[in-house]
Each structure stands twice: as structure tokens, then as C-alpha cells.
Amino acid sequence: MIAHHFGTDEIPRQCVTPGDYVLHEGRTYIASANNIKKRKLYIRNLTTKTFITDRMIKVFLGRDGLPVKAESW
């Protein structure tokens, strides 16, 4: 879970960029790649790597209203 965020919002899968914090099935992930041709958003956390094919993705928002970016590992 991220420390500070200002709510969540659902945005189209194509608009998610690598590094965005994503909420999927109650767990927090980081978007790693967005393959628009295959219609897959690849996500990861410390223990899991998977992909999402949903059209709308829930992201955490920062104080500026934009998706929160992860720090590089």
C-alpha cells in the first residue's frame, strides 16, 4: 500500500503508463508495461507478476489529480 494518496479513479487501460500505482482485486500493483495491440496491461508487486485485460483500470491519485508514480526499485 502506498503511504499518501488522494483517492482513486478509473481510467482507460490505454492511458495507464509504466510506474502508475494500480488497484486490482483489492491489491496494490505497479504498472510495468502496456501492450495496446494485445490489449494487456502488465502489473507487478514484490511477489506477483500478472496482466489485466479490463477496459477500465483503477489507479491511485496524487494531490494534483494525476496517477501516483512509483519510485524506481
Swiss-Prot record:
Protein's UniProt keywords contain Ion transport: no
GO BP terms in the entry: cell division; negative regulation of cell division; response to antibiotic
Keyword entries, A-Z: Cell cycle, Cell division
Keyword Translocase set for record: no
NCBIfam families with a match to the protein in the record: PRK11354.1
Note: This protein is encoded on Rac prophage.
Purpose: Causes inhibition of cell division. At high levels of expression, can also abolish the rod shape of the cells. Division inhibition by KilR can be relieved by overexpression of the cell division protein FtsZ.
Entry protein name: Killing protein KilR
